[in-house]
């Protein structure tokens, strides 16, 4: 299980070890160009490819992308249908590239809601890349932070039914080991494109001590230069994890 930022002080550096991104603004990017919203989602796939490659080159070890939230089912049916098709196409087209780049793919979320073909493709892609370790790419699909905490609670109680009668034995570490990304360190840097400033039910537990970076740039236009700007901002942050600035003097700020 990964180290918790509320239980210990994680090691940090100039390059965030774990970057989490809400890829927002696809629809607005398309609307401003008098294109259907679906065109923006298609263009956003290219941005994913750019950012995965850029993170790998810069030494990021974990990249988590919010692809489809549990609330996105509320969108128009044709848009949801296209997003599902894009997911299928990306898995079919990109898995060989991920393998060549040493990228391990993880998909987290309630995958039972997807069609069997998509579930099968997800399983195959994860199995194909499971021995890679250069970059861990996690795609959150039909994911919600509250769902994650609920499913972890249920899994914890199934693993140890006696906890229901002795709740004082429940602590952060016991619950955290059942979260969908228990194997990964908590994000150091959270990025949201598109100008909105909220986390939208993404990694509610895991973002406790992440640095939050918001940019007006729409996701289809986001690439290596924009990622470098986020990293440059990140290097200015004083990551205290509950300590005072005085305690950090003479040592590393992050």
From Swiss-Prot:
Keyword field contains Metal-binding: yes
Active site positions: 24, 72
Positions annotated to bind substrate: 25-29, 37, 41, 69-71, 73, 75, 192, 198-200
Cofactor entry: Mg(2+)
Function: Catalyzes the condensation of isopentenyl diphosphate (IPP) with allylic pyrophosphates generating different type of terpenoids.
NCBIfam families in UniProt: uppS
Record family assignment: Belongs to the UPP synthase family.
Name of the molecule in the record: Isoprenyl transferase
Organism: Bordetella pertussis (strain Tohama I / ATCC BAA-589 / NCTC 13251)
């Amino acid at each position: 299980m990964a180290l918790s930022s509320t239980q210990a002080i994680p090691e940090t550096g100039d390059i965030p070890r774990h970057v989490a991104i809400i890829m927002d603004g696809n629809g607005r990017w398309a609307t401003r160009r008098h294109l259907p919203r679906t065109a923006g989602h298609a263009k956003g796939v290219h941005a994913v490819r750019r950012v995965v490659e850029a993170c790998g080159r810069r030494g990021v070890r974990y990249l988590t992308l919010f692809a489809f939230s549990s609330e996105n089912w509320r969108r128009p049916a044709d848009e949801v249908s296209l997003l599902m098709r894009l997911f299928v196409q990306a898995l079919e087209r990109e898995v060989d590239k991920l393998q060549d780049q040493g990228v391990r793919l993880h998909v987290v979320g309630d995958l039972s809601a997807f069609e069997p073909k998509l579930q099968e493709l997800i399983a195959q892609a994860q199995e194909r890349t499971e021995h890679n370790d250069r970059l861990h790419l996690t795609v959150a699909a039909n994911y919600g932070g509250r769902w994650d905490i609920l499913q972890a609670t249920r899994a914890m109680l199934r693993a140890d039914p006696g906890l229901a009668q002795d709740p004082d034995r429940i602590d952060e570490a016991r619950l955290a080991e059942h979260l969908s990304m228990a194997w990964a360190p908590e994000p150091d840097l959270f990025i949201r494109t598109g100008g909105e400033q909220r986390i939208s039910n993404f990694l509610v537990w895991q973002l406790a001590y992440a640095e939050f970076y918001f940019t007006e740039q729409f996701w289809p236009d986001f690439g290596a230069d924009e990622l470098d700007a986020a990293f440059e901002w990140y290097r200015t942050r004083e990551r205290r994890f509950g300590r005072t600035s005085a305690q950090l003097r003479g040592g590393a700020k992050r």
